[in-house]
A protein has these predicted regions:
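N-terminal secretory signal peptides that target proteins for export/translocation
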Residues: 1-6
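Bacterial N-terminal signal peptides
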Residues: 9-21
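Peripheral terminal and inter-domain segments
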Residues: 27-155
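K/E-rich alpha-helical interaction surfaces of small helical-bundle regulatory domains
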Residues: 61-73, 328-332, 339, 344
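A mature extracytoplasmic/lumenal domain signature
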Residues: 80, 89, 99, 109, ...
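Low-complexity, intrinsically disordered Gly/Pro/Thr-rich segments
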Residues: 113-124, 329, 336, 340-345
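Extracytoplasmic cell-surface/polysaccharide-interacting catalytic and binding patches
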Residues: 145-241, 256-338, 347-363
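Beta-rich nucleic-acid/ligand-interaction surfaces
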Residues: 247-253, 343-350
């Protein structure tokens, strides 16, 4: 939803993980960079594993996450049925469970025999220790109630909407393709919608769209229909959170956001990719249950976990993420560098910034 990469500078090289026959599947992509220090390049991922991984054991789920030490952040993740520790973004070390909260490093690592002990407070994991080193758990997910960006609008949103509807998008010159926005559900009713900006479940906790509908430029919409049909063979469909976004909504986002958080929203003076009708935010849903699958991060999350190549989480979460990305890229979409859920269709720059409201499309 937000162009945070465009406001920052790429620093350093992309770290890549060393592989382990025990811990890493041959087809997983793990290159990434920490959000606070450097930003990752969205390289083409290796194909998702043909065999769907099993869910991680429930007893490990509370342990998975990031832990901050004096000089590094340690990631505890599950891969191929093993719990592992990732050091310095390069060294992946498998763990062997001894008790509920005590592990030791596997014999395949240079840390063989060292103990890893997790500590809890009222049932919640708060830290881990390795010898004399202590790593404090870093709150990441919404289940921990931290680091989920929420923006308190500077002014009442209804007033901002009224003002934005009276404003004009930036004037653009050049040759553009004709706008041909089509409604996704009219092309394929099996595409599910959960339009967050038609609800209060979003960054601003405010409703922006008067209708829960999703539109894309026709070539992008038809490509997404092909993605949805191909995914059915694997037992999945696409669930769309956002598509075409009228320019006036982008202006409201900007006007509602404090200066120190404006890097998370698009500048209306330039417009956003969503304004051009070729950007889509989406995830997968399970055809059997009808429910959205679990990914490494939540939608619109602003932590490192949102990166398309973030190595943490579980094998199944990463497999879902890579399955979506592979399917989208096969039909001409490109993933956004900092958000696994945001994809841009090829030639998106060739469309004008749009400002037509949902109610007026197709009239």
């Amino acid at each position: 939803m937000r162009p945070r990469i465009g406001k920052l500078v790429f620093i350093g090289l992309i770290a890549s993980l060393l592989t382990s026959a025990i811990c890493i599947g041959a087809n997983e992509s793990h290159a990434f960079s920490p959000r606070a220090v450097r930003l990752q390049v969205a390289t083409t991922p290796k194909p998702a594993k043909p065999r769907k991984p099993l869910p991680a054991p429930a007893r490990w789920r509370p342990l998975i996450g990031e832990y901050v030490g004096d000089s590094e952040t340690l990631i505890i993740l599950e891969t191929d049925g093993r719990l592992c520790a990732l050091f310095k973004r390069t060294e992946l070390a498998p763990l062997k469970q001894l008790t509920a909260d005590t592990f030791e490093f596997d014999s395949s690592t240079t840390r063989k025999g060292e103990r890893v002990v997790f500590s809890r407070n009222r049932g919640k994991v708060t830290q881990l220790t390795i010898g004399t080193l202590t790593y404090k758990r870093k709150p990441l997910g919404p289940e921990e109630g931290a680091n989920q960006l929420k923006i308190q609008p500077l002014r009442p949103v209804p007033i901002l909407i009224k003002e934005a509807l009276s404003a004009q998008p930036p004037n653009e010159t050049g040759d553009f393709l004709p706008t041909d926005l089509v409604e996704l559900r009219k092309l394929d009713p099996t595409i599910k919608l959960e339009i967050r900006y038609a609800t209060t479940n979003n960054l601003f906790s405010t409703v922006f769209y008067s209708q829960a509908r999703a539109f894309l430029q026709r070539p992008a919409a038809e490509a997404l229909v092909r993605v949805n049909r191909k995914l059915k063979a694997a037992g999945y469909g696409v669930l769309v959170h956002d598509g075409y976004r009228p320019w006036y909504v982008t202006k409201v986002f900007w006007d509602a956001t404090p200066d120190d958080k404006k890097l998370f929203v698009a500048d209306p003076a330039k417009g956003s990719r969503h304004n051009r009708g070729c950007a889509v935010d989406l995830t997968l849903y399970d055809l059997k249950t009808g429910k959205a699958v679990e990914m490494v991060s939540t939608y619109d999350e602003t932590t490192d976990r949102a990166y398309p190549n973030y190595p943490g989480g579980t094998s199944l979460q990463r497999w879902h993420r890579d399955l979506l990305r592979s399917a989208m890229e096969a039909e001409g979409f490109t993933v956004y560098e900092a958000e696994w859920w945001h994809f841009d269709y090829k030639d998106w720059q060739k469309y004008r910034i749009g400002n037509v409201q949902f109610e007026q499309i197709g009239r």
